[in-house]
Amino acid sequence: MSIFISIASYQDPLLVSTIFSAYNNATNKDELIFSICDQSDNPMNIEDLAFEKQVRYEHVDPVFSKGPCWARHRAQSFYQGEDYFLQIDSHTQFLPNWDVLFEEALLKIEAEQINDSYFAKPIITSYPRSFKVLDFDKGLFELNTGDKHTQVITYRKDSLFSRGSFSRQIGIPTKYTDITHAYLMAAGCIFTRGRFVEDIPYDPNYYFYGEELSMALRAFTHGFSFFHIPDVPLFHLYTDVSNIPRKLHWDPEDDKNRAIKWNELEKKSLDRLDDLFAENIEGSMGLGSERSLDDYAMISGIDLENKKVLDLQQATESTFLVSIDWKKNPINK
C-alpha cells in the first residue's frame, strides 16, 4: 500500500513539521514515499531523517522557481509506480491512521464500479479543515476536529468567470455525514490511485489561478470522478488566520530578482486556461475523450466552453451535491 506524497514547498517554516506529522501519524510508515520540491533559501538536511531512504528531495533557489504548478510538476517527476498518490501543501497536519482512513474511503468508492464505471477512477479531495499554531518551537498545534461533517467545494458566487474562463472556488461546510459527489478539486488535498500521476501529469505552464480548475477538467474528461468524504484526516494552515509568517511566490523581495515576473506567469496561466476549454491544447496536458464539457455542465451547472452559468444554485451552493445519492452516477441523474 505504498503512498507517494507530493509536496511543493515555498519558503515554508512548517515543511518539516508537515513531513513528520504525515510520517508519525501513519499506520504503515514504511509504505510512505515523500517527494519534495523545496523552494527555499536553505535546503533541508534530509540525511538527518531516520526515514531518509523514503524521501526524494529537490532543493530549488527561490529565484529560479516558476510557481506552484511548476514545483508540483517537479515533485511528480520522482514518481516510481507507487500504489497511491497524495498531494498536500507544506503546511498540513494529520490525524492518526490517516493512511488507512484514506485507503478505506477510496476502496469503498471503487467498489461501486461493479455497477457503474463512473466509480472506476475516484479522487478524494477537499479544502481541509484548519489548524492553529499554538507554539511553533514546541510543535504544538490545535486541530479543528470539532466539525466532522462533509465539506464540499463549489464555485464562488461573486467570482464566476471573473477572469476569462477562470472562476474562484470555495469550501462550504455541510451538516452531511456521508460521502458526496464533487465537481471541483483542491490542490492541497488529493488522494487517488498512483496512476493519476501518469494519466494527469501536472502542467507546469499554470501558475496559481487556473491550477485547480484545469486539473479538475483534465481529470474529469479522462474518466476520473471526484468525491468528498466526512472527517478528512488532514488539516491545513490558512494564511489569512496564521500567525506564522510565510512568503508566497509573488513576494516582491523574491520576485524582483526573477527574469519572468509573477504577473507575467499569471497572465500566461489564464490564457492557457482559455486554450484548454477551447480544446486548443493537445496531448496529455489537454482534455480527454472519455467525458465531455457537456457532461461536466450537467454535474456542475457551469458551461465552461461558452462561459455560461446554467444553474446558479447547483454551481455555488452545497444543496445539489448533498442531495444526490453518492452511489449513483450524477451525469445520469
Residue map of PLM features:
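Catalytic cores of eukaryotic secretory-pathway lumenal/extracellular enzymes that build
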Residues: 2-301
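Non-catalytic, C-terminal membrane-associated alpha-helical segments of glycosyltransferases
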Residues: 279-333
